[in-house]
Amino acid sequence: MPPPTATVAPAAGGSFPELTCPADFAAVAAPGGRFSVVGFGSLLSERSARSTFPELEGFRVAALRGFRRVFAHAAPIFFERGIAIEATKEFSSLSVEPCDSELIVVTVFEIKEEEVPAFIEREHEFRFLAVVPEGLDGVPFTNRAVVCARYSDEEYFQGRCQGSKEIYYQRYGRYNIDKIWRDDILPCRLYLRHCVLAAKNLGEPAYSFFLDHTYLGDRKTTIREYLTTTGAGIMEEEPPESLKSRYGG
């Protein structure tokens, strides 16, 4: 099967319906009441996906057209787990954002309806978009899926935090994060290693697409380039024993 290409029928950026509350998710429910979720970072790993969604079904590789994968999201979980390096700004997680000319290889799986509220809470700072993934053969899926896309700090503060500085502090401020979506930070080292290993475990074209179609905040430097320059050595670093299962690919 040939690898997918990003040159055919690109999606229009910003044309993806936004899901703002649990009720909106009903519009993308598959027959049987399950919801399809797109994995683009740690959820490329089936082990990670099952640790988050123990009863998931149908874990598979897919392609998502019209999106770019970028390290531009300050993630508090890395501070909680002691793996953020604040001095070098290495505490970025992944997000995706609409980009007409791009295509990324992802995973898709189904979760139960009752898992949706917890999913929304866990991905509190993201914009939930309804998308149509496709197989690696280019055939669109029958059902839409939900992807966690880049939000904006202002929208997040006014919407999800209801304009409350206390809510923001509990989620971000206590980690000295005053801006979530930023382009001047670098990948959390253990998280990046985990994502690369997870993509590699999926085989081709997932591995090559992750290296060549995942970018730093400058939207120019690919992860393949980063790992051979500034990020050299990341793939040789082992997580601490307590996190080996969580960040083992």
Residue ranges and their predicted role:
Residues 2-249:
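A glycine-rich, hydrophobic/aromatic-adjacent loop/helix-cap motif
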